[in-house]
Amino acid sequence: GCSITYLTVTNGDLGDSTGTLDFSEIAALRREETMTAGKVLGVSDFLFYDLPDGSLSDIPSLAGRIAETIRTLQPDVIFCPDPWAQYEAHNDHIVTGRAAAQAFISSSLSRYPRGTRTAPWQAGAIAFYFTQKPNTVIDVTDTFETRFAAMAEHRTQLSEELLGLYRIYFSMQGQKLAEGKDFALGEGFKVLGPLHMHCFTEAPEI
């Protein structure tokens, strides 16, 4: 087994599809949903930066904050959305992915971020999800339903209809990723080490 910590950067306060809740109410509800869903997946700890939804733009500042979290938690692997995915239009996902990548390669520097008092730490790998160029496929056959049980807890985000569409999509995607392998459903990640993330022009082909 392993210990998993969820870091949620924004507070989700733009996520009320009904338009009936105020910002603080929806933020509190989104936090509750995140924790409930995470517990379904076996997440042990939760961290929230509580930045307003749709507000992210300062990659260096966010990267420094994430680096401090990395140095405190000392993770083996960092998971984040792939910020270089073509046609990804969700700015908060893009900025968070870029900041996480910057933090991943910089958290081992003794003076990064400026003024830090935490000890350097280098995670072994960063794994980008929602990627178009996976280099690692994990067997998720036995955990596929657990994933959707967790997703279903995000009631402010996913209607039954949308959840059903995602089930079809991820099932088809999982079958495609599992082709030629000895399992039925796969999930793809772009997994890179720290040396791949700076001045390494072959990284897209790895």
Residue ranges: model-predicted function:
Residues S57-I206:
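Metal-dependent de-N-acetylase/amidase catalytic core
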